Amino acid sequence: MIIPNLLPNLLSNLLSNLLPILPSILVPLVGLLLPAITMVLSHLYIQKDEIL
């Protein structure tokens, strides 16, 4: 009986520990990393010599 209850308890503990720090991970990701990737990709696209 201990083994079937282990996985739900482990998942609930993981989620309860992860949820408070999730904004600390997502805010820099969305605010800094995604715009940086977008700027690099748009720069590479603009600098292509091909005309479609």
Curated annotation (Swiss-Prot):
Query: Which of UniProt's keywords are assigned here?
Result: Chloroplast, Membrane, Photosynthesis, Photosystem I, Plastid, Thylakoid, Transmembrane, Transmembrane helix
Q: Where in the cell is it found?
A: Plastid, Chloroplast thylakoid membrane
GO cellular component terms, alphabetically, are: chloroplast thylakoid membrane; photosystem I
The answer to whether keyword Phosphoprotein applies is no
Biological process terms from the Gene Ontology for this record are: photosynthesis
Cross-referenced InterPro entries: PSI_PsaI, PSI_PsaI_sf
Xref: Pfam families = PSI_8
Highest rank taxon of the organism: Eukaryota
Query: How is this protein positioned relative to the membrane?
Result: Single-pass membrane protein
Q: Where are the transmembrane segments?
A: 21-41
> In which broad location class does this protein mainly occur, judging by the first location in its UniProt entry?
plastid
Q: Which HAMAP family match?
A: PSI_PsaI
User: Its family?
Assistant: Belongs to the PsaI family.
The record's function comment reads: May help in the organization of the PsaL subunit.
Protein name per the record: Photosystem I reaction center subunit VIII
Q: Which organism is it from?
A: Pinus thunbergii
The gene is psaI
